[in-house]
Amino acid sequence: MNFVEELRWRGMLQDIMPGTEELLNKEQVTAYLGIDPTADSLHIGHLCGVMILRHLQRCGHKPLALIGGATGMIGDPSGKSAERNLLNEETLRHNQACIKKQLAKFLDFESDVPNRAELVNNYDWMKEFSFLDFVREVGKHITVNYMMAKDSVKRRLNGEARDGLSFTEFTYQLLQGYDFLHLYETKGCKLQMGGSDQWGNITTGAELIRRTNGGEVFALTCPLITKADGGKFGKTESGNIWLDPRYTSPYKFYQFWLNVSDSDAERYIKIFTSIEKEEIEALVAEHQQAPHLRALQKRLAKEVTIMVHSEEDYNAAVDASNILFGNATSESLRKLDEDTLLAVFEGVPQFEISRDALAEGVKAVDLFVDNAAVFASKGEMRKLVQGGGVSLNKEKLEAFDQVITTADLLDGKYLLVQRGKKNYFLLIAK
């Protein structure tokens, strides 16, 4: 399996330094990619980089995932228009442990193979580095003219923000450059990879190695992932789509992928899964024959949800989706945990009802007309119930005056009323 060819057909290759492909074809290469540790979870904006490390290891090379502990304390101006919040060491260590756990789902850190993945943290070699040593050993090799020529620096100096660029952020490219030098000297690392906005920082590292060691190293970057409509990938109205279920439930994670556009699904299934080329081509052809069946989106959502979470979480997400969009049963509704239930019915009208009244028993007609405005009138409700068009917790309401009690509550708190095929209402007992 050819690593560069793999990235190329998947649409994961932007820039590549001359000689990189030849090196990868000639020997087992140690390569690294930096990961920002400013949160204790990765989000899907990190996934392209993580998949590059995964493909690298699958092709027989050795991946190093570099946690930017030292650089995370400073902030990188690349692609940013403002200063970053700085982190303390305790937070960084916690974030590192959480991120490694997530990376272990994609990379083999445990086996004894020569290309076993490693996690490194640049704080470990930067924390004892004095300013004087850094200036002497690193600073003298790179000119200010060279640093000023970088696009990321130019953008910040010439941008609309009037706060300019701090010295701290200006020196970021030297710190990242030193990471490459350190890994070259200690791990034999000859290749750095990253997002296309990192090209300037990566080439600074290659230049530093050339000037200090006379060594030749290489670089490649992946393109910025966008949406077909030009919007930012991985962002929703409620923020990032996280890999940690504490921040983004597996159901919401699954729904994100399921709801991407046709053109995005065709690109994303190459980037965010390990499905082989022939199978993807067959899926694309199948999808084009019947786009309304959303075969690409369903397979994409399945693969990524299982990879990030588990098959069990994927199955639960499908079941939860069927409750709103399919022929689900009362049993499948009752299996939902509270967070998923609320996520599934996030957009439906909600009403508060009295728990005390339910404890004594309330007629459905009083509850759904007087207490919660599910129906405009008792006449409308009677007609719909008689026609079999009203369900409570996915079971047909048998009678207009059926008595409802706390025993009917889902999770001891909720009632789900369905009026007709598509109108849902969530009643919350308080």
Swiss-Prot record:
Pfam families: SYY_C-terminal (PF22421), tRNA-synt_1b (PF00579)
Annotated NCBIfam families: tyrS
Compartments reported by the entry: Cytoplasm
Subunit structure, as described in the record: Homodimer.
Binding-site residues, L-tyrosine: 32, 172, 176
Disulphide bonds in the chain: none
GO annotations of cellular component type: cytosol
Residue intervals of the S4 RNA-binding domain: 362-429
GO function terms (MF aspect): ATP binding; RNA binding; tyrosine-tRNA ligase activity
The protein's role, per its UniProt record: Catalyzes the attachment of tyrosine to tRNA(Tyr) in a two-step reaction: tyrosine is first activated by ATP to form Tyr-AMP and then transferred to the acceptor end of tRNA(Tyr).
InterPro entries from the UniProt entry: aa-tRNA-synth_I_CS, aa-tRNA-synth_Ic, Rossmann-like_a/b/a_fold, S4_RNA-bd_sf, SYY-like_C, Tyr-tRNA-ligase, Tyr-tRNA-ligase_bac-type, Tyr-tRNA-ligase_bac_1
Protein name: Tyrosine--tRNA ligase
Family: Belongs to the class-I aminoacyl-tRNA synthetase family. TyrS type 1 subfamily.
Short motif ('KMSKS' region): ranges: 232-236
Gene Ontology process terms (BP): tRNA aminoacylation; tyrosyl-tRNA aminoacylation
Reactions performed catalytically: tRNA(Tyr) + L-tyrosine + ATP = L-tyrosyl-tRNA(Tyr) + AMP + diphosphate + H(+)
SUPFAM superfamilies listed in its UniProt record: Alpha-L RNA-binding motif, Nucleotidylyl transferase
